[in-house]
């Protein structure tokens, strides 16, 4: 059974694994060392998570196991749009991708953000990431094309 629910305080350390899983590695390339998570431009996604007023996270739990997470935070990261727009990150453990859980998790997060009064949410996605079409179906539009990725925005 799948449950979409808020991340519990004691589960916050698990965001490190989900951040690692969120890093898009093009097919044929070797996985990156987990030490990359200590780089400041990645660490900012999870460091002291829950201590900022705009830190929100939801998880997908299947048979008492956390298999996916979506979280937002207002920060000047790859997905930065403006100071009122949170940046969104989402990932799943490899065995739980492409099963429709992402749709459930993202819909729940977008509904939460609407209820909290956010006008929009942003994300960045690599140009060759298959998730690009998924984000477009959810209402994200490209607001900036960069060398390797797109900055996308979903107006709520």
Describe every region a protein language model picked out:
Residues 10, 14, 66, 129-130:
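Short alpha-helical
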Residues 23-25, 29, 34-84, 89-93:
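Acetyl-CoA-dependent GNAT
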Residues 89, 98-111, 136-137:
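Conserved acetyl-CoA-binding loop-helix of GNAT-fold acetyltransferases
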Residues 113-126:
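Conserved GNAT acetyl-CoA-binding A-motif
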Residues 136-146:
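Conserved acetyl-CoA-binding loop of GNAT-fold acetyltransferases
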């Amino acid at each position: 059974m799948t449950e979409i629910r808020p991340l519990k305080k004691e589960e916050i350390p698990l965001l490190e694994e989900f951040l690692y899983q969120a890093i898009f590695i093009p097919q044929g390339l070797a996985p990156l060392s987990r030490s990359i998570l200590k780089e400041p431009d990645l660490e900012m996604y999870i460091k002291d998570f829950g201590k900022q007023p705009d830190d929100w996270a939801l998880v997908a739990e299947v048979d008492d196991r956390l298999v996916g997470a979506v979280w937002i935070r207002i920060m000047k990261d790859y997905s930065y749009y403006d100071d009122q727009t949170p940046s969104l990150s989402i990932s799943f453990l490899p065995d739980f991708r492409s099963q429709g859980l992402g749709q459930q998790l993202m819909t729940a997060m977008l509904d939460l953000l609407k209820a909290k009064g956010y006008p929009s949410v942003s994300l960045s996605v690599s140009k060759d990431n298959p998730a690009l079409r998924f984000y477009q179906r959810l209402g994200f539009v490209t607001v900036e094309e960069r060398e390797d990725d797109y900055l996308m925005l979903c107006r709520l």
